[in-house]
Amino acid sequence: MKTIGLIGGMSWESTTSYYQIINETIKKELGGLHSAKILLYSVDFVEIEHYQAVGDWEKSGQLLADIAQRLEQAGADFIVICTNTMHKVAPQIQKKITIPILHIAQATAQALLVDGIQKVGLLGTKYTMTQDFYKEKLIESGLEVLIPDQVGITEVNRIIYDELCLGNIKESSKQTYLAVIDDLKKAGAEAVILGCTEIGLLVKQFDTDLPLYDTTVIHAEKAAEWGVNK
């Protein structure tokens, strides 16, 4: 079994989901008392959020690259960045290590294509929805990507940082998300990517008839697969 290097804490709530899903998947795959071999480095999220807010991606990338190096030195066989947004600096991190990074957007694209999805809506932080680092991975895989209008982008992003990252789950915010999802459906989306590891804490598949692809679940299950097979 491979040792999984997790970079978590962005936020810690979603990182606990990674730990649980990876171990549940390993147990299902191998049975018995098997559990995942995991090294976890959990950051102080306030540092990362500050660098995001001021646009200092170089600094945040260096911080995570240093962590990835420590995980590699400690015996990790591959790296899992437990957040969508910070995959913006994945290339910078990869340059500093010799082990692979399991990219969350590539794992998600594979899951969509297996299910025959061609046009997909994307929800996430404003960085994930509007910048190319994430959407390009989806487009390169042959997917057409739709995002909310500017009002939707602002509200989706606000709820992530002001509520979900603080562990606050509000019914009013769920309804806001469901309205945005409905707009994406009307625009032709065949499914929606929950492209922030916190969104799955708020919106569940039973809340809508449009297929939802929770990147936390997809990424964590793929990490378990790599841990067993790669």
Predicted regions and their residues:
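Non-catalytic structural scaffold of enzyme domains
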Residues: 1-230
